[in-house]
Amino acid sequence: MGRVVGASSSTGVSQLAGKTPYSITYAEVNYAVANKLKVAHVINPAGNAVEPNSVNTSAFLAQADMDANGIMTFNYATKEAGAYPLGIVSYLLADTASADKTKAAAVKSLATYLLSPSCAKDKGAALGFSVLDGDFLKKAQSLVAKIG
C-alpha cells in the first residue's frame, strides 16, 4: 500500500518526489525539469500523446474563448493535434480607476512586461510557461491598457 507525504512549496514537492522511488506528484514543468523528474504525456481528444510544454499548452489555450474581461473558457474537447489539454492561465487583477496613479503605473508596467516577448517568449517559454499570441495577446494587451 502506498503512502501520502507532503512538502512545502513546488520546489520541496519536486525535490521530495525526486528522492522517493515510485512517487507520483504534480508540479509545474520547470520544477520537474530542474529535479530531473519524468513528465506525463497526456492523450488528448485528437488521440495524440502530448507532453506538457510551452508549444503544446499554447496550442490548447489558442482553442479557448476569451470574453471582454479576459476570462477564458477552455475547450477540453479540442481536436487540435498538439494541444496539451491540462493547460492553465494566471489572471492579474488590477484597478482601472486607481487613486494611486504611481502604483497603477507600476502594475501596468509589470503586466506589459509579462506579456512582452522578452518575458513571455524569451524567458517564460524556456521554463515551460504557455505564451499568449495572436488575438489572445491583443485582447490581453487591451485589458492592460485599461489599468489606471
Task: Map each language-model feature to its residues.
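Short linear sequence motifs
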Residues: K19, I24, D67-N69, A77, ...
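Ligand-binding pocket segment of bilobal, Venus flytrap-like solute-binding proteins
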Residues: M1-Q63
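Extracellular/periplasmic juxtamembrane helices and adjacent flexible linkers that interface
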Residues: F74-G148
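Residue-level signal for the start and early helices of compact helical domains
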Residues: V4, Q15, N30, D65-D67, ...
